[in-house]
From Swiss-Prot:
The active site is at 155. Residues 1-23 are annotated as: Disordered. The gene is hopBF1. This is Type III effector protein HopBF1. It comes from Ewingella americana (strain ATCC 33852 / DSM 4580 / CCUG 14506 / JCM 5911 / LMG 7869 / NCTC 12157 / CDC 1468-78). It is an enzyme of class 2 (transferase). InterPro entries: T3SS_HopBF1-like. CDD domains: HopBF1. Adopts a minimal and atypical protein kinase fold. Transmembrane segments: none annotated.
Length: 203
């Protein structure tokens, strides 16, 4: 049985644990492919070494007083933990470094939609029946698992792939706690798919 941390309350989240990270834990990436995205903390590049992966590097100064190495390690550990708990994730493979920046090598999801762009109405889900059904079904499955395991996922966000499958991306932590806040985050995305399906049915 995979253990879920229960010693950190989500409301008191202070960032990654203080566990030290050995420098040789980070694999050197000699060169980067095309930049394919950017978030609040990381820049994302296509991997030249493995076209199935992308390299996500923390920008300097984006992790506050917490070393970026610890953030990267915690993201890798949490992603693996969620995967072992049966959640769909953008899989993380290794700790990486490039020219002084550190981060994580992850699956490259082609033509992905960011859930934050969807819920903030910056982008829309496609008006496609199967696509929206997949989003709805995946959201329902994630909600069921959150309830069954009684866990909260810190900084829960998703990528939606080109088929409408929903994948947890960039998680900060998973703790034994009320799942209500996490379920609310899932429902934000779910409501967009549901509205699309209602519109399709009315046409």
């Amino acid at each position: 049985m995979f253990n879920v941390s229960n010693n950190v309350a989500p409301s008191r989240y202070q960032g990654p644990s203080s566990t030290s990270v050995t420098p040789n834990a980070f694999h050197d990436v000699p060169s980067l492919g095309q930049k394919v995205g950017a978030g609040s903390q990381k820049d994302v590049f296509h991997s030249r070494q493995d076209p199935r992966q992308c390299i996500c590097l923390f920008r300097p100064g984006t992790t506050g007083s917490i070393p970026a190495e610890q953030y990267a390690q915690k993201e890798l550990e949490t992603t693996k933990q969620l995967k072992n708990l049966g959640f769909p994730v953008v899989d993380a493979h290794a700790l990486v470094k490039h020219q002084g920046s550190v981060g994580v090598a992850k699956d490259f999801i082609h033509n992905a939609l960011d859930s934050e762009d969807i819920v903030n109405n910056k982008k829309s889900l496609p008006d496609n029946l199967k696509f929206n059904k997949n989003v709805l079904e995946d959201c329902n499955a994630i909600i069921r698992r959150l309830k069954n395991l009684e866990v909260h996922i810190e900084d829960l966000q998703f990528l939606v792939d080109h088929n409408g499958h929903v994948l947890i991306n960039d998680p900060r932590d998973v703790v034994r706690s009320s799942p209500d806040k996490s379920i609310s985050k899932v429902n934000e995305l779910r409501s967009h798919a549901l509205n699309n399906l209602l519109d399709i049915d009315s046409d």
